[in-house]
A protein has these predicted regions:
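Cys-dependent protein tyrosine phosphatase-like superfamily
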Residues: 1-90
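A phosphate-binding catalytic loop at a beta-strand-loop-alpha-helix junction
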Residues: 90-99
Length: 99
């Protein structure tokens, strides 16, 4: 797992696992935003698994699934609102970290 810093309060990453949560928490991340729909890939953990691990380490999880290449203006607006209201720093993740 590689965290890419966008600014002081926002990071992106490819798919994370429950085992990554300790490292993420140690980096000071407070909120995870999952942009990957559950079931998109056979090898991905679902958001519930990530959320359970995150809660054990005091992290918040927001689930905003979007389909790669089909992100709507409404979803962009929703993401902006979720980010603005989230406890920071925020890590948004999907399969590649590019959504």
């Amino acid at each position: 797992m590689e965290l890419k810093r966008v600014n002081q309060d926002f990071y992106v990453a490819g798919q994370i696992t429950a085992n990554d949560i300790v490292k993420i928490a140690d980096q000071g991340i407070k909120t995870l935003i999952c942009n990957r729909p559950d079931g998109e890939g056979a090898d991905q953990p679902n958001v519930i698994e990530i959320e359970e691990a995150a809660q054990r380490h005091g992290l918040n999880v927001i689930y905003q699934p979007v389909i790669s290449g089909k992100i709507s203006d409404q979803q962009v607006t929703e993401f902006k609102q979720l980010y603005q209201n989230a406890q920071k720093p925020v890590l948004a993740y999907c399969r590649s970290g590019m959504r």
